Amino acid sequence: MTTGLSLDEGKVIEGRPKALRDKVLIVFSNKVFNREEILFEVFGVEDNAGKQVHRGVDWTTKYYTVTIDVYVDSFSNLEDWTNEFCDPDFDELRDVIAGWIIVLPFSGNIEEETKALSRLVNNATSEDFFTAILATELNVGKNERAFLEYNVLAGAVELVHNELDSDGELKEVNGVDRVKEIIDTCDWHPRLLRTAHLESETGMESACTGISLAQIMGSLREARTKYMAMDPGLDREEFANEMANELSKLL
């Protein structure tokens, strides 16, 4: 996989192959206190010491297996996190993400959260991109809930609620189960898929398994800043290609 370094107007270097989308980003509100449980139930990975990148996670259905990287992040304020993540410096990061899952409680005035989520959807870089919102709490009135669902549907976002049935169990199509269904139906690139009829080879382990999401985002910002400060010319393009190769090892 090779990722192009973003240029002045966010364009990928001409002629560079398009990156495959083999990452899933899950982002937790700091108000979610069972993130370890959710992370394990969805992806089967441990939330060890706040680890932000889990590489080589096999996602298996009845029909296929795909190996993905799971990126984990958190926020105290969704609007602030959205403003940073939608920054042009992180075009390359968004270009390799197949979808994201936002986990947060909804309570009281939800207009701010809805606006931030709408901006995230607008920055989705592919029609095949999925967005799921796992609402750990939906403590809002009927009007607020209708407002949320209207805006969610308008933005092609799927709202999932951890709602309990009369026996205290999660309903089959709600909560974590529904999030997993959404990932199951993701339109993965054929090159990423391994089916029951094909022998799969284990993918190469990344040399950057210890790299955090914060370090990746920092490297993207640093590379873009240096690129923009250089004079146009051959040296600038050579730097762009070198950085693209280096950054592709991180993503």
UniProtKB/Swiss-Prot annotation:
This is Increased recombination centers protein 6. Belongs to the IRC6 family. InterPro entries: Irc6. Signal peptide: none annotated. It comes from Lachancea thermotolerans (strain ATCC 56472 / CBS 6340 / NRRL Y-8284). One of its GO terms (biological process) is vesicle-mediated transport. Keywords: Chromosomal rearrangement. GO terms for molecular function: protein-macromolecule adaptor activity. Involved in gross chromosomal rearrangements (GCRs) and telomere healing. Gene3D superfamilies: 3.40.50.11960.
